[in-house]
Protein backbone atom coordinates (compact mmCIF):
# COMPACT_ATOMS: atom_id res chain seq x y z
CA UNK A 1 0.00 0.00 0.00
CA UNK A 2 2.78 2.47 0.89
CA UNK A 3 4.72 1.45 -2.18
CA UNK A 4 1.73 2.10 -4.46
CA UNK A 5 1.02 5.45 -2.80
CA UNK A 6 4.60 6.66 -3.15
CA UNK A 7 4.94 5.34 -6.71
CA UNK A 8 2.22 7.79 -7.73
CA UNK A 9 4.24 10.64 -6.27
CA UNK A 10 7.50 10.13 -8.16
CA UNK A 11 8.63 12.93 -10.46
CA UNK A 12 11.38 12.44 -13.03
CA UNK A 13 13.17 15.47 -14.45
CA UNK A 14 16.21 16.06 -16.61
CA UNK A 15 18.17 19.20 -15.79
CA UNK A 16 21.40 20.00 -17.63
CA UNK A 17 21.52 16.42 -18.88
CA UNK A 18 21.22 14.93 -15.38
CA UNK A 19 18.32 12.63 -14.61
CA UNK A 20 16.68 13.44 -11.28
CA UNK A 21 14.07 11.19 -9.73
CA UNK A 22 12.36 12.08 -6.49
CA UNK A 23 9.20 12.17 -4.46
CA UNK A 24 6.82 15.06 -4.78
CA UNK A 25 3.70 16.28 -3.07
CA UNK A 26 0.61 15.28 -5.08
CA UNK A 27 -0.41 18.93 -5.45
CA UNK A 28 2.75 20.18 -7.18
CA UNK A 29 5.00 19.12 -10.06
CA UNK A 30 8.10 20.16 -8.18
CA UNK A 31 10.55 18.47 -5.84
CA UNK A 32 10.59 19.99 -2.37
CA UNK A 33 13.37 18.76 -0.09
CA UNK A 34 10.81 18.74 2.75
CA UNK A 35 8.39 16.36 1.02
CA UNK A 36 11.12 14.27 -0.55
CA UNK A 37 12.99 13.69 2.71
CA UNK A 38 9.81 12.78 4.57
CA UNK A 39 8.65 10.38 1.85
CA UNK A 40 12.10 8.76 1.78
CA UNK A 41 11.41 7.27 5.21
CA UNK A 42 9.08 4.79 3.50
CA UNK A 43 10.48 4.94 -0.01
CA UNK A 44 14.01 3.96 1.00
CA UNK A 45 12.91 0.32 1.10
CA UNK A 46 12.03 0.08 -2.60
CA UNK A 47 12.87 3.28 -4.53
CA UNK A 48 15.81 2.57 -6.87
CA UNK A 49 17.12 6.17 -6.98
CA UNK A 50 17.61 7.84 -3.63
CA UNK A 51 20.66 9.91 -4.47
CA UNK A 52 19.86 12.06 -7.51
CA UNK A 53 17.65 14.56 -5.64
CA UNK A 54 20.19 14.92 -2.84
CA UNK A 55 22.94 15.37 -5.41
CA UNK A 56 20.94 18.07 -7.20
CA UNK A 57 20.24 20.03 -4.03
CA UNK A 58 23.96 19.75 -3.20
CA UNK A 59 24.91 20.93 -6.69
CA UNK A 60 22.68 24.00 -6.40
CA UNK A 61 23.63 24.84 -2.81
CA UNK A 62 24.82 28.42 -2.33
CA UNK A 63 28.39 29.07 -1.28
CA UNK A 64 27.18 30.17 2.16
CA UNK A 65 25.40 26.81 2.68
CA UNK A 66 21.84 27.85 1.89
CA UNK A 67 19.75 25.15 0.21
CA UNK A 68 16.75 25.74 -2.03
CA UNK A 69 13.32 24.62 -0.80
CA UNK A 70 12.35 23.22 -4.17
CA UNK A 71 12.97 23.11 -7.89
CA UNK A 72 10.76 22.48 -10.89
CA UNK A 73 10.78 22.55 -14.67
CA UNK A 74 7.02 23.08 -14.98
CA UNK A 75 5.24 26.44 -15.15
CA UNK A 76 3.49 27.16 -11.85
CA UNK A 77 1.77 30.47 -12.53
CA UNK A 78 0.08 30.30 -15.90
CA UNK A 79 -0.10 32.13 -18.20
CA UNK A 80 2.79 34.37 -17.12
CA UNK A 81 5.36 31.62 -16.56
CA UNK A 82 6.38 29.72 -19.66
CA UNK A 83 7.86 26.31 -20.23
CA UNK A 84 11.46 25.44 -21.10
CA UNK A 85 12.98 26.79 -17.92
CA UNK A 86 14.13 25.54 -14.54
CA UNK A 87 13.01 27.33 -11.40
CA UNK A 88 14.66 27.22 -7.97
CA UNK A 89 12.95 28.70 -4.91
CA UNK A 90 13.94 29.40 -1.32
CA UNK A 91 11.08 30.51 0.91
CA UNK A 92 12.84 32.85 3.36
CA UNK A 93 10.59 32.00 6.32
CA UNK A 94 11.33 28.25 6.16
CA UNK A 95 13.91 27.20 8.74
CA UNK A 96 13.90 23.42 8.22
CA UNK A 97 15.39 23.20 4.74
CA UNK A 98 19.03 22.55 5.58
CA UNK A 99 18.33 19.89 8.18
CA UNK A 100 15.97 18.14 5.75
CA UNK A 101 18.75 18.16 3.17
CA UNK A 102 21.03 16.47 5.72
CA UNK A 103 18.24 14.03 6.63
CA UNK A 104 17.69 13.11 2.97
CA UNK A 105 21.41 12.45 2.54
CA UNK A 106 21.45 10.29 5.67
CA UNK A 107 18.44 8.24 4.54
CA UNK A 108 19.94 7.72 1.07
CA UNK A 109 23.24 6.61 2.61
CA UNK A 110 21.44 4.37 5.11
CA UNK A 111 19.53 2.62 2.31
CA UNK A 112 22.35 2.32 -0.21
CA UNK A 113 25.45 1.99 1.93
CA UNK A 114 27.21 4.48 -0.32
CA UNK A 115 30.08 5.30 2.02
CA UNK A 116 32.18 7.06 -0.61
CA UNK A 117 29.13 9.02 -1.79
CA UNK A 118 28.28 10.31 1.70
CA UNK A 119 31.94 11.00 2.47
CA UNK A 120 32.18 13.22 -0.63
CA UNK A 121 28.94 14.95 0.36
CA UNK A 122 30.04 15.76 3.93
CA UNK A 123 31.43 19.25 3.12
CA UNK A 124 28.03 20.24 1.66
CA UNK A 125 26.18 18.80 4.65
CA UNK A 126 28.44 20.60 7.10
CA UNK A 127 28.05 23.84 5.18
CA UNK A 128 24.25 23.51 5.34
CA UNK A 129 24.30 22.99 9.10
CA UNK A 130 26.72 25.87 9.58
CA UNK A 131 24.38 28.12 7.58
CA UNK A 132 21.28 27.32 9.62
CA UNK A 133 23.16 27.54 12.93
CA UNK A 134 24.69 30.93 12.16
CA UNK A 135 22.02 32.83 10.23
CA UNK A 136 20.28 35.40 12.47
CA UNK A 137 16.88 34.69 10.87
CA UNK A 138 17.02 31.00 11.70
CA UNK A 139 19.17 30.56 14.80
CA UNK A 140 18.44 31.68 18.35
CA UNK A 141 21.88 32.13 19.87
CA UNK A 142 20.53 32.42 23.41
CA UNK A 143 18.50 29.19 23.29
CA UNK A 144 20.73 27.32 20.86
CA UNK A 145 17.69 26.40 18.77
CA UNK A 146 16.46 26.88 15.23
CA UNK A 147 13.69 29.46 15.08
CA UNK A 148 11.08 30.29 12.49
CA UNK A 149 8.93 33.35 11.96
CA UNK A 150 5.21 33.08 12.69
CA UNK A 151 3.42 33.72 9.41
CA UNK A 152 0.07 33.21 7.76
CA UNK A 153 1.53 30.66 5.36
CA UNK A 154 2.67 27.07 5.77
CA UNK A 155 -0.13 25.97 8.09
CA UNK A 156 0.47 28.58 10.80
CA UNK A 157 -2.79 30.44 10.53
CA UNK A 158 -6.45 29.42 10.64
CA UNK A 159 -8.58 32.46 11.44
CA UNK A 160 -12.24 32.03 10.55
CA UNK A 161 -13.98 34.44 12.96
CA UNK A 162 -16.23 31.48 13.73
CA UNK A 163 -17.75 31.49 10.25
CA UNK A 164 -16.21 28.35 8.78
CA UNK A 165 -16.08 25.24 10.97
CA UNK A 166 -14.57 23.25 8.12
CA UNK A 167 -11.52 25.49 7.87
CA UNK A 168 -10.14 24.58 11.29
CA UNK A 169 -10.91 21.08 12.48
CA UNK A 170 -9.24 18.16 14.19
CA UNK A 171 -9.61 14.48 13.42
CA UNK A 172 -10.02 12.57 16.68
CA UNK A 173 -10.86 9.08 15.42
Which stretches of residues belong to each language-model region?
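Extended, well-ordered alpha-helical scaffold segments
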Residues: 1-5, 48-60, 114-135
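Alpha-solenoid repeat scaffolds
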Residues: 50, 63-64, 73, 77, ...
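Alpha-solenoid helical-repeat scaffolds
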Residues: 30-33, 95
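The feature captures the catalytic groove of carbohydrate-active enzymes
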Residues: 25, 70-100, 133-173
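Generic hydrophobic/packing signal
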Residues: 61, 71, 75, 105-113, ...
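Well-ordered alpha-helical scaffold segments within catalytic/enzyme domains
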Residues: 36-49, 100-117, 173
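The substrate-binding groove and active-site-proximal loops of carbohydrate-active enzymes
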Residues: 33, 85-91, 109-119
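Low-complexity, Ser/Thr/Pro/Gly-enriched N-terminal "stalk/linker" regions
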Residues: 1-31, 51-52, 56, 66
Amino acid sequence: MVRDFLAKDVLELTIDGNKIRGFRSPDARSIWIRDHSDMMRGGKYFEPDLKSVVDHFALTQAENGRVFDYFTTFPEKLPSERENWTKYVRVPVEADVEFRFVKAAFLAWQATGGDEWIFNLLPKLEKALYYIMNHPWYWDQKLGLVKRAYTIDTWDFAYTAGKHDWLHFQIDD
